[in-house]
Amino acid sequence: VAGGIPIIKALREGLAGNAIGRITGILNGTCNFILSTMRATGRDFADVLKEAQGLGYAEADPAFDIDGIDAAHKLAILTSVAFGTEVDIKSVHVEGIRHVSSLDIRYADEFGYRIKLLGLAERDGKSGGIVQRVYPC
């Protein structure tokens, strides 16, 4: 999980005395490559996806990555460790990057923002439960 960063060990051992309220991160390298390349080159999603496949960053069937499923699974693992709870993957709201256009990227850039596929888990102040979502923002 998280590209070789020892995040699970840090959550289990290094942050054991702390209360974690939120996890936020970029959890899928394929999506990050696609979105970063779209921004840098102005090219459209399909073109950059094809490049990612040619470079071996994306699978022949990239749905697991670009539809956010891989990031959702990673988020569920991190949530389970960080919050000490079992996570049903079906409880994670998931949106992928398949519909992010070069125009979306350009508009975000004009306002000083970068579109990334983020995984976010946080405690719901009202219910006390955990809210999890993966979405481009």
Regions found by a protein language model. Give the residues of each.
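Substrate-binding/catalytic subdomain of NAD(P)-dependent oxidoreductase enzymes
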Residues: M38, V48-C137
